[in-house]
UniProtKB/Swiss-Prot annotation:
Tagged with keyword Acyltransferase: no
Similarity field: Belongs to the EAF family.
Disordered as annotated region, ranges: 106-268
The keyword Nucleus belongs to this UniProt entry's keyword annotation: yes
Compartments (UniProt record): Nucleus speckle; Nucleus, Cajal body
Function: Acts as a transcriptional transactivator of ELL and ELL2 elongation activities.
Phylogenetic placement of the source organism: Eukaryota, Metazoa, Chordata, Craniata, Vertebrata
Species in which this protein is naturally found: Mus musculus
Protein name: ELL-associated factor 1
One term under GO cellular component: transcription elongation factor complex
Key words of the record: Activator, Nucleus, Phosphoprotein, Transcription, Transcription regulation
Biased composition (Low complexity): 188-203
Length: 268
């Protein structure tokens, strides 16, 4: 009832009528509601909304005066049935007294504004506020510095396999030089023996020829110088020139061998 009730009752007798809640098939039910807190900005001239959900859950939405923030208040609670409680309703305009049976008692508490009701539709009709620019997300925290990890140590390789030392090469060079020296010495010795044989053979031929001349008769006239025996001079020339060339090569090879040995000793 939104009308102003007269707190004073007259002392006259009135007819009391039982309301519809006392019928076998009641067409109406009455409830009592208790609020823990009701804001002063609630508009009492507007209708509210009451919703009953599962498990006797009750949601009540009451509008506020236009321009208030928030535009409504939502209450939530539970209902409990009454056993033998009634309420007296007095209509001061008609002077009628009606007694109604109470069905349940509802106790609610104030919550935040929400709900899908007529009041919510009224709110949607109001101009929407421009959306506020969203703030950029905060930068990620700096990552801690980590020292670079060392690669795992691989199998160690011996330096001799990767970089072979020059000592084996020097040994090979020494062997080659010594082999050449031996070959040259053999050649020189063989050439010397052949030259001595040729000289001895030429001497024996001269002796035999001279003795034969004495036995047979007078000696033949001397031949010109260019018709001297063929084997005497080339044999001497070959015997003298060849040892000289081989001795020079021997000296060169020996010097190289000494230098290589001295170089290997200095490296050691």
């Amino acid at each position: 009832m939104n009308g102003t009730a007269n707190p004073l009752l007259d002392r006259e007798e009135h007819c009391l009528r039982l309301g519809e809640s006392f019928e076998k098939r009641p067409r109406a039910s009455f409830h009592t509601i208790r609020y823990d807190f009701k804001p002063a900005s609630i508009d009492t001239s507007c209708e509210g909304e009451l919703q009953v959900g599962k498990g006797d859950e009750v949601t009540i939405t009451l509008p506020h005066i236009p321009g208030s923030t928030p535009p409504m208040t939502v209450f939530k609670g539970n209902k409990r049935p009454y056993q033998k409680d009634c309420v007296l309703i007095i209509n001061h305009d008609t002077g009628e007294y009606v007694l109604e049976k109470l069905s349940s008692s509802i106790q609610v508490k104030k919550t935040r504004a929400e709900g899908s009701s007529k009041i919510q539709a009224r709110m949607e009709q109001q101009p929407a506020r421009p959306p506020q620019p969203s703030q950029p997300p905060p930068p990620p925290p700096p990552m801690p510095f980590r020292a670079p990890t060392k690669p795992p140590a691989g199998p160690k390789t011996s330096p001799l396999k990767d970089n072979p030392s020059p000592e084996p090469q020097l040994d090979d060079i020494k062997r080659e030089l010594r082999a050449e020296v031996d070959i040259i010495e053999q050649m020189s010795s063989s050439s010397g023996s052949s030259s001595s044989d040729s000289e001895s053979s030429s001497g024996s031929d001269d002796d035999s020829s001279s003795s034969a001349g004495e036995d047979n008769g007078p000696a033949s006239p001397p031949q010109p110088s260019h018709q001297q025996p063929y084997n005497s001079r080339p044999a001497v020339a070959n015997g003298t020139s060849r040892p000289q060339g081989s001795s020079q090569l021997m000296n060169t090879l020996r010097n190289d061998l000494q230098l290589s040995e001295s170089g290997s000793d200095s490296d050691d």
